[in-house]
Amino acid sequence: EYLCLHIENQINAGADTVQIFDSWAGLIPNEILYDHCYIPNKKIVEFCKEKKAPVICFPRGINKKYLEFAKIVKPNCLNLDYRIDPMWAKENLKNFCLQGGMDPNILFKSENEIFKEVDKYLTIFKDTPYIFNLGHGLLPKTNPDTLKKVIDRVNNFR
């Protein structure tokens, strides 16, 4: 209830998309995942859709339960965590817009290795609704220059 009030205030202040980070979803036991992850997320998604705000859900760590989550919760987009195989996601979540997936640790590797991983995601999801992003947050020592190169790579990808 309070979360929806906060989201409504964000929408009224100009937010045009809402992202729900369910950071602990992967730690919820299977027996209670439906009641303690799917249903609360579904209520928030329904509220956002009533307010005409698209919703991206990030149920971190639920692994191959992403499909079940997506079918029940019905977000506009799913943010993949870095443990999800991108080919599995493309094959099994093909009816959904997807975001993310790349391991943030890749950003500490050589430029060639980074670009290889970026290109992998962009190639796999080339013909599907996909938003390039990481599969988790930036790590504290990530070099901003590396991020600029990644952004340039994404923007210039053909």
What are these regions (language model features)?
Residues E1-R158:
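Active-site loop segments of alpha/beta catalytic cores
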